[in-house]
Amino acid sequence: MNNIIPTEETHPLTWRLRNDRETVWIEEYCKKNGYFSLKKALKTMCPEDVVHLIKESGLKGRGGAGFSTGLKWSLMSKDNSSKIRYLLCNADEMEPGTYKDRFLMENIPHQLIEGMLLSAFALNVSRGYIFLRGEYIKAEYILKKSIQEAINFGFIGSNILNSGFNFELFLHTGAGRYICGEETALINSLEGRRANPRAKPPFPAVFGLWGKPTCVNNVETLSNVPSIVLHGVNWYKKLSKSTDTTGTKLMGFSGKVNNPGVWELPFGTTAREILEDYARGMKSGLFLKSWQPGGAGTDFLIEKHLDLPMDFTSIAKAGSRLGTAIAMAVDNKTNMISLVCNIEKFFSRESCGLCTPCREGLPWIVKILESLEKKEGHKNDVKNLERLCLDLSPGKTFCAHAPGAVEPLQSAIKYFRLEFEAGISIKKLKKCSNILGIQSNEFTSKV
């Protein structure tokens, strides 16, 4: 295993971590160059300078989509007639198998807060909210205490560091809905409405929280901002081994590996390096059957893809998405039907129910998979699953929930079709008629 020695020059997100993994509170954070970036920005830069810096750095969103952060910031409404603008931190980390944001919030909370302060300064925002997953009880306590610490030290409030910059920061805990990870559903929830996605346009940058210009960024994205402001664009670009994406990324492996965890690594590090050098390989007696690059809502890949660089373009070319870059290893003793069925049950339960394809399609997928799992499937079940994947593909539903939900299913069928076909009942195979239209797969056929 590689022995990581985090330094400020090579590990901007994690070099402040304590060896005992206790929280880095504000006094220790300040001793480790904490809030230096904020002081630099407020004293020597204007908001436009910070936006330009982030755009030039190539920082991409770390929530999964990989959209340019600087470009997203530049889309904020330039209409200064509206003095009220909002910055929202999406900390509603509910993607199964993902835990990177919790890692940052519980260990280095002031890095996130400083990132929000810098982002707010760049966007002329005076109020921010951290929308936290409700189940993150420890993170809630730590963030509340950290916000109060920042207020006491004069980093949050009015006329921060005598600069004329004002910023209030509030913590809001969610009610346990996965769909709040979608930025407009998050906004609806924060307003006290049902957590349904909104139609776009208008985009939040123009019409967001309470109808005001709003920017929504992920925890890890915001945590990258202080180091970029402090050390500059050229330094940040050199951190990466990829020609596609700049900087570093929290990456990890879970599943039946010897050392599951999360590590800050350069973009371009291969999945094999992470699995073998950091996660120490599969447990004794097991070998890798498949893996998901970045959460439950990403397509499965197989062993031959382990040598791909972990960046947005390389993983996309292989037919999946980098997502959160917290990978899940699937071992050879895992039944793919059972695994995918479990994933689809989660996504079916978490559908907001707004659009018909998602509301009706995902439960039907679960029903078919349950039959296949019991080896009671029907002749056309696998074909119907493939058709449902097409029916729930991008552009056919109101948001990206359903398209993401069927990614693991379509890829599992692609690579492990025989396992799914093995779930078809021999008896029903002999006596079977085609399913006409969208209806239950439980039917009787004429003999």
Curated annotation (Swiss-Prot):
It comes from the Bacteria. GO terms for molecular function: 4 iron, 4 sulfur cluster binding; FMN binding; metal ion binding; NAD binding; NADH dehydrogenase (ubiquinone) activity; quinone binding. FMN binds at residues 174-221. Its cofactor is [4Fe-4S] cluster; FMN. Binds 1 [4Fe-4S] cluster. It catalyses: a quinone + NADH + 5 H(+)(in) = a quinol + NAD(+) + 4 H(+)(out). Keywords: 4Fe-4S, Flavoprotein, FMN, Iron, Iron-sulfur, Metal-binding, NAD, Quinone, Translocase. InterPro entries: NADH-UbQ_OxRdtase_51kDa_CS, NADH-UbQ_OxRdtase_suF, Nuo51_FMN-bd, Nuo51_FMN-bd_sf, Nuop51_4Fe4S-bd, Nuop51_4Fe4S-bd_sf. It holds the Pfam family Complex1_51K. NAD(+) binds at residues 61-70. [4Fe-4S] cluster binds at residues 352, 355, 358, 399. The keyword Signal does not apply. Its EC number is 7.1.1.-. NDH-1 shuttles electrons from NADH, via FMN and iron-sulfur (Fe-S) centers, to quinones in the respiratory chain. Couples the redox reaction to proton translocation (for every two electrons transferred, four hydrogen ions are translocated across the cytoplasmic membrane), and thus conserves the redox energy in a proton gradient. Composed of 13 different subunits. Subunits NuoCD, E, F, and G constitute the peripheral sector of the complex. Belongs to the complex I 51 kDa subunit family. This is NADH-quinone oxidoreductase subunit F. It comes from Buchnera aphidicola subsp. Schizaphis graminum (strain Sg).
